[in-house]
Amino acid sequence: MSMSDPIADMLTRIRNGQQAQKASVTMPSSKVKVAIAKVLQDEGYIEGFSVREGEGKAVLDVALKYYAGRPVIERIERVSRPGLRVYKGTDDLPRVMNGLGVAIVSTPKGVMTDRAARASHVGGEVICLVA
């Protein structure tokens, strides 16, 4: 059976892995998942990620990050989902925790944070919120 929301599955694996104090989590890879992982790494929410070939399919390994024994990601939640897509213009992009967190947005210029989207004057689909 195929997965209906692979991005929500990715976010859930990261959330569950951090609650279980895992060093890393693995999941099936895709271009969008790699782009989201790159944004999370650039913002300092994960240690890093790598894509490797496993059993004929690409696998994404995400190295989780902790500070003083606690997960760096306090909250990660899906906003736009297959049943209800959420699109926002430049001026309507959400601010997470008044700028302390990030919203990950899929724009015509690629996947980026809400701050980068505002600076580029582009809107798009709000994928998730991370704090």
Curated annotation (Swiss-Prot):
Write down the SUPFAM superfamilies for this protein, in alphabetical order.
Ribosomal protein S8
Q: Which domain of life is it from?
A: Bacteria
Xref: Pfam families: Ribosomal_S8
Q: Name one GO cellular component term.
A: ribonucleoprotein complex
List membrane-spanning regions.
none
Keywords linked to the UniProt accession = Ribonucleoprotein, Ribosomal protein, RNA-binding, rRNA-binding
Q: What is one Gene Ontology biological process annotated in the Swiss-Prot or TrEMBL record?
A: translation
Read off the PROSITE patterns from this record: RIBOSOMAL_S8
| Molecular-function GO term, any one | structural constituent of ribosome
Q: Which Gene3D superfamilies match?
A: 3.30.1370.30, 3.30.1490.10
Query: Quaternary state and partners of this protein?
Result: Part of the 30S ribosomal subunit. Contacts proteins S5 and S12.
Function field: One of the primary rRNA binding proteins, it binds directly to 16S rRNA central domain where it helps coordinate assembly of the platform of the 30S subunit.
Return the similarity comment: Belongs to the universal ribosomal protein uS8 family.
PANTHER family found in the cross-reference section: 40S RIBOSOMAL PROTEIN S15A (PTHR11758)
Protein name as it appears in the record: Small ribosomal subunit protein uS8
Q: Which organism is it from?
A: Azoarcus sp. (strain BH72)
The taxonomy runs: Bacteria, Pseudomonadati, Pseudomonadota, Betaproteobacteria, Rhodocyclales
